[in-house]
């Protein structure tokens, strides 16, 4: 069983679909090309391009790799970028972000578990970058956008 907060439950939900997406000879090259393109966009600090490569209206571009999963991959791929860092966006973060006043996040009631628009994801990354800059100035110490994302993840809706 996975430890709490590591992004997967004891059942490893979705892993079979993720493995199948890259094991299937018919879809492998297409899926690898999509993943490579997204990782390249993340590495140069372009969260919108990275996200839009892996999302389609109402579904993921690669079966089993939805936004809650692939934004984690993009986060690590964007390490060290001089551009805007890709940040993790999942239902916990979205719920706490909504509770903090960012009400433009698409949702159904208290359900934030479906895909977000590319413009929403890009705005989210820019918002947390701006908040980090403001916090850095106030505290006179470096605050990073991913620290704010982590605080949102651990927030009251968790």
Pin down the residues of each PLM region.
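A near-ubiquitous, low-amplitude feature marking generic local secondary-structure context
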Residues: 53-56, 76, 111
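Helix-hairpin-helix/helix-loop-helix acidic hairpins
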Residues: 2-62
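Generic hydrophobic, helix-prone segments enriched in Leu/Val/Ile
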Residues: 1-4, 32-40, 85, 100, ...
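Amphipathic alpha-helical interaction surfaces
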Residues: 6-13, 76-79, 99
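C-terminal accessory module of base-excision DNA glycosylases/AP lyases that mediates lesion recognition
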Residues: 71, 78-158
């Amino acid at each position: 069983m996975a430890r709490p907060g590591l992004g997967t439950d004891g059942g490893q939900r979705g892993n079979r679909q993720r493995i199948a997406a890259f094991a299937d000879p018919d879809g492998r090259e297409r899926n690898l090309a999509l993943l490579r393109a997204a990782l390249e966009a993340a590495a140069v600090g372009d969260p919108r391009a990275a996200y839009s490569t892996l999302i389609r209206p109402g579904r993921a571009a690669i079966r089993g790799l939805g936004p809650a999963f692939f934004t984690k991959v993009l986060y690590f791929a964007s390490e060290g970028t001089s551009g805007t860092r890709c940040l993790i966006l999942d239902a916990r973060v979205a719920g706490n972000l909504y509770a903090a006043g960012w009400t433009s996040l698409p949702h159904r009631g208290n359900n934030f578990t479906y895909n977000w628009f590319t413009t929403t994801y890009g705005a989210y990354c820019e918002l947390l970058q701006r908040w980090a800059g403001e916090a850095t100035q106030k505290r006179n110490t470096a605050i990073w956008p991913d620290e704010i994302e982590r605080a949102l993840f651990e927030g009251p809706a968790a």
